[in-house]
From Swiss-Prot:
Quaternary structure and interacting proteins, as annotated: Heterotetramer of two alpha chains (FadB) and two beta chains (FadA).
Catalytic reaction annotation: an acyl-CoA + acetyl-CoA = a 3-oxoacyl-CoA + CoA
Single Gene Ontology BP annotation: phenylacetate catabolic process
GO cellular component: cytoplasm
Gene name of the encoded protein: fadA
Protein's recorded name: 3-ketoacyl-CoA thiolase
Lineage: Bacteria, Pseudomonadati, Pseudomonadota, Gammaproteobacteria, Alteromonadales
Family from the record: Belongs to the thiolase-like superfamily. Thiolase family.
GO MF terms, alphabetically ordered: acetyl-CoA C-acyltransferase activity
Primary residence: cytoplasm
Function, as annotated: Catalyzes the final step of fatty acid oxidation in which acetyl-CoA is released and the CoA ester of a fatty acid two carbons shorter is formed.
Keywords: Acyltransferase, Cytoplasm, Fatty acid metabolism, Lipid degradation, Lipid metabolism, Transferase
Keyword Electron transport found: no
Subcellular location: Cytoplasm
Length: 387
């Protein structure tokens, strides 16, 4: 079977969704700039070789509608001979884009793909136009469509305290801020034009969402937002609302070597799994177990892990049940996560994978895992191997 490899991976800075640096920048522009960036960074690649552009996006309406993958690829000047498709696996959309490209390569259906994802949550809110079928109530509780309440449920089932959640959130901001000031995000962030608070055009080179001032005391002052009476999940222990995009150049290994392109990682295994929608945040556990089995490894073999922080209350049960509680500070989300950086839905899968690959290089690691939960009860996971 042919091997799928990551040649390059980049992301935009993460902008605040409320009056942030990308308030005047459209989702198609964020996407197109990354597509152009991949080609500029890899001049050996003839753009005419691109088979397909596979782009994750959840709210496919307004500026994100009518196949944003194609709109952005045309904006980027990618040859019209390349295909383009927008995919939606909710939070796992751009990781699913990775999987789609990898499967195509492994089965001989193309050897050069640009993949990624975007979500401009400031322009297209997560709940915009959502209308669940009334018949779903026969199988799924109404609260299962409210992600914060599913996090409350998962936290209660696993005995996760408010203090544990607050500590996890503080860690996320501290780690992300340290990664910023120490330049550890510099390799993955591709600067994008935006606007400062006064409306002046600027080149955005750092994440806007991180709050380094976050402390246990400041989080303790926040009220539960989803279950105000009995809940423990606050805005501070939930992923921030942010705008951003991520992108990868994925190729068949021998093709990349023939063009003298760098091979940053190989896709070792992939998996998706379902779980009860009421505890959607538990999805990374069965998805990871599948991916590890397919790779022929155990969780102990993993050197670095990126677990998307949708909520602290869902991340901590996954850490516990995957047997990772003792290695959090050594292996998991070493540069912070979505609580600090935000979770632009269609962007996050390729974003955490990009961060993972850079961490693997920094630590000279061999095996890494990127995994995330998905609304309405799914999980997705990818094992990467440096070669």
């Amino acid at each position: 079977m042919k091997q799928a490899v990551i040649v390059d991976c980049i992301r935009t800075p993460m902008g605040r969704s409320k009056a942030g640096v990308f308030r005047n920048v459209r989702a198609e522009t964020l996407s197109a700039e990354l597509m152009k960036g991949l080609l500029l960074r890899n001049p050996q690649l003839d753009p005419n070789l691109i088979e397909d552009v596979i782009w994750g996006c959840v709210q496919q309406t307004l500026e994100q509608g009518f196949n944003i993958a194609r709109n952005a690829s045309l904006l980027a000047g990618i040859p019209k001979t390349a295909g383009a498709v927008t995919v939606n696996r909710l939070c796992g959309s751009s990781m699913d884009a990775i999987h789609q490209a990898a499967r195509a390569i492994m089965t001989g259906m193309g050897d050069t793909f640009i993949i990624g994802g975007v979500e401009h949550m400031g322009h297209v809110p997560m709940s915009h136009g959502v209308d669940f079928h009334p018949g779903l109530a026969n199988n799924v509780a109404k609260a299962s469509g409210m992600m914060g309440l599913t996090a409350e449920m998962l936290g209660k089932l696993h005995g996760i305290t408010r203090e544990q959640q607050d500590a996890f959130a503080v860690r996320s901001h501290q780690r992300a801020y340290a990664a910023t000031i120490e330049g550890r995000f510099a390799k993955e962030i591709y600067g994008i034009e935006g606007h400062d608070a006064n409306g002046a055009l600027i080149k955005v080179l750092q994440d806007e969402v991180i709050r380094p001032e976050t402390t246990m005391e400041s989080l303790a002052a926040l009220r539960p937002v989803f279950d105000p009476v009995n809940g423990t999940v606050t805005a501070g222990t939930s992923s921030a609302l942010s705008d951003g995009a991520s992108a990868m150049l994925i190729m068949e290994e021998s093709k990349a070597r023939a063009l003298s392109l760098p091979i940053r990682a190989r896709i070792r295994s992939m998996a998706v799994a379902g779980c009860d929608a009421a505890i959607m945040g538990y999805g990374p556990v069965p998805a990871t177990q599948k991916a590890l089995a397919r790779a022929g490894i155990t969780v102990a073999d993993l050197d670095v892990i990126e677990l998307n922080e949708a909520f602290a209350a869902q991340s901590l049960p996954c850490v516990k049940d995957l047997g990772l509680a003792d290695v959090v500070d050594d292996k998991i989300n070493l540069n912070g996560g979505a609580i600090a950086l935000g979770h632009p839905l269609g962007c996050s899968g390729a974003r955490i994978s990009t961060t993972l690959i850079n961490l693997m290089e920094d630590k000279d690691a061999t095996l890494g895992l990127a995994t995330m939960c998905i609304g309405l009860g799914q999980g997705i996971a990818t094992v990467f191997e440096r070669v």
